[in-house]
C-alpha cells in the first residue's frame, strides 16, 4: 500500500490580508475567505496536481504566517489579531507570528520560507502548497525542487479603483515562473457558486474577526428586551 502523500500548506498572511480587504470592501461578495473551506479545497487540489487524480491517502499540515508580531508577547494592536487566531486554530491551522518585524511594520513573514525548507530538509514533506503573491518567496520553489519537492502556488491578479487611481494586485512574476503549478485564485473564487461556505470559499455571516463586530443583539432604547412583543 502506498505511503500517504504529505503536503505542507503554507499561507502568507500578508497576501491574505490584502485579498480579504479586496473581497470584503470591493468585490460583490463583500465577505472574507472561510479558512476551513479553503483548507478542504486545497486538500482536493493537491491530489489533482501532484497525483493526477490517482487515489492516495493524504496528510496535510496547514500553517498560517502572520504579518504581525505576537500580541501575547508585545501586547500591541492585538484585538483583531487575537480574534483571527481564534478563527484559524479551530479551522486546522498552526499560527506563526512575525516576531522579527519592527513595531508598526507589516510585511511578508519570511519565517514561512525557513520553515518550509526545514520541513523539506528533514523529509517531512512530499509537496508544498504556497498561498502568496509576494516576490520575497520567489526563491522557495527552486530550492524545494532541488530537494525533489514540487510547489503549487495559489495567487491572485485583480484591479480595483481607489480615490482617483487604480490599485493593481498581482502575483510576482518570478514566483509564478519558478513554481511547478500555478492556480489563478481570482478565477476560481469569482463564481457565485463559491460565494458561501461550506460549499464555497466565503463566510456566510459578518466577518468574525472584525474590530467593529458587536455580538450583542440590537435593542430599541427604552424597551425591555425580555418583554413580550405587542402585535398590531
Could you say what each language-model-derived stretch is?
Residues 50-52, 191, 205, 223:
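Intrinsic disorder/low-complexity signal
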Residues 79-212:
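Nuclease catalytic cores that cleave nucleic-acid phosphodiester bonds
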Residues 11, 133, 218:
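Single, functionally critical "micro-switch" positions that shape active/binding sites
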Residues 213-215, 221-227:
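Intrinsic, low-complexity polybasic segments
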Residues 1-106, 157:
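Domain-level signal for Mg2+-assisted phosphodiester chemistry and nucleotide/NA-binding surfaces
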Residues 1, 7-8, 199-201, 216, ...:
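N-terminal leader/targeting segments
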Amino acid at each position: 500500500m502506498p505511503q500517504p502523500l504529505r503536503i505542507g500548506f503554507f499561507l502568507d498572511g500578508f497576501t491574505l490580508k490584502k485579498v480579504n480587504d479586496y473581497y470584503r470592501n470591493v468585490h460583490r461578495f463583500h465577505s472574507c475567505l472561510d479558512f476551513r473551506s479553503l483548507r478542504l479545497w486545497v486538500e482536493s487540489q493537491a491530489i489533482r496536481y501532484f497525483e493526477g487524480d490517482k487515489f492516495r491517502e493524504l496528510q496535510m499540515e496547514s500553517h498560517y504566517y502572520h504579518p504581525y508580531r505576537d500580541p501575547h508577547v508585545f501586547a500591541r494592536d492585538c484585538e483583531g489579531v487575537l480574534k483571527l487566531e481564534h478563527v484559524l486554530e479551530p479551522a486546522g491551522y498552526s499560527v506563526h507570528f512575525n516576531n522579527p518585524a519592527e513595531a508598526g511594520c507589516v510585511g511578508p513573514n519570511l519565517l514561512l520560507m525557513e520553515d518550509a525548507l526545514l520541513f523539506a530538509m528533514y523529509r517531512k514533506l512530499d509537496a508544498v502548497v504556497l498561498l502568496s503573491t509576494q516576490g520575497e518567496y520567489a526563491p522557495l520553489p527552486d530550492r524545494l525542487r532541488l530537494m525533489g519537492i514540487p510547489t503549487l502556488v495559489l495567487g491572485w491578479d485583480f484591479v480595483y479603483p481607489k480615490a482617483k487611481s487604480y490599485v493593481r494586485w498581482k502575483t510576482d512574476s518570478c514566483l509564478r515562473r519558478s513554481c511547478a503549478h500555478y492556480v489563478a485564485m481570482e478565477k476560481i473564487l469569482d463564481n457565485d457558486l463559491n460565494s458561501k461556505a461550506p460549499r464555497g470559499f466565503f463566510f456566510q455571516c459578518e466577518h468574525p474577526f472584525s474590530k467593529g463586530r458587536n455580538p450583542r443583539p440590537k435593542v430599541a432604547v427604552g424597551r425591555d428586551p425580555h418583554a413580550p412583543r405587542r402585535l398590531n
